[in-house]
UniProtKB/Swiss-Prot annotation:
Disulfide bonds: none
Organism for this UniProt entry: Chelativorans sp. (strain BNC1)
Protein function: RNaseP catalyzes the removal of the 5'-leader sequence from pre-tRNA to produce the mature 5'-terminus. It can also cleave other RNA substrates such as 4.5S RNA. The protein component plays an auxiliary but essential role in vivo by binding to the 5'-leader sequence and broadening the substrate specificity of the ribozyme.
Quaternary assembly: Consists of a catalytic RNA component (M1 or rnpB) and a protein subunit.
Protein name in UniProt: Ribonuclease P protein component
Length: 120
């Protein structure tokens, strides 16, 4: 095993009810995406859900936006996520034209700057 610290891989939000629950939390609007977050109040790994509405474009464009967001979370932002927190990222069309470096920096900056306070 190497000397590097173990990365905590975020889980996934899969059910509609989980996505709807996060809507009650903090909303951070930006040019590239909307970030919603909600503290669950436990010490489990963070969970992430990514969604792109049909208003954004056709299926090919929506899938490309999802892939870019997933990779930005995997490569850069996962280390900044707080345990016991659910995150929903709503992608916008501008992600298609944004440089990947700008996307991952913006995502990391928003997550790092807004770790929610514990509730409960």
């Amino acid at each position: 095993m190497s000397g590097r610290a173990q990365r905590q891989h975020p889980g996934r939000l899969t059910k509609r009810a989980e996505f709807l629950a996060v809507q009650r939390g903090l909303k951070l609007r930006g040019r590239l995406f909307l970030l919603e977050l909600l503290a669950r109040g436990d010490d489990d790994p963070p969970r992430v859900g990514i969604t792109v509405t049909k208003k954004v474009g056709n299926a090919v464009e929506r899938n490309r936006i999802r892939r870019r967001l997933r990779e930005a979370v995997r490569v850069h932002a996962a280390d900044d996520m707080a345990t016991g927190t659910d995150y929903v990222i709503v992608g916008r069309r501008e992600i298609l034209d944004a440089p990947f470096g700008a996307l991952k920096d913006e995502l990391s900056r928003r997550i790092r700057g807004n770790k929610p306070a514990r509730t409960g």
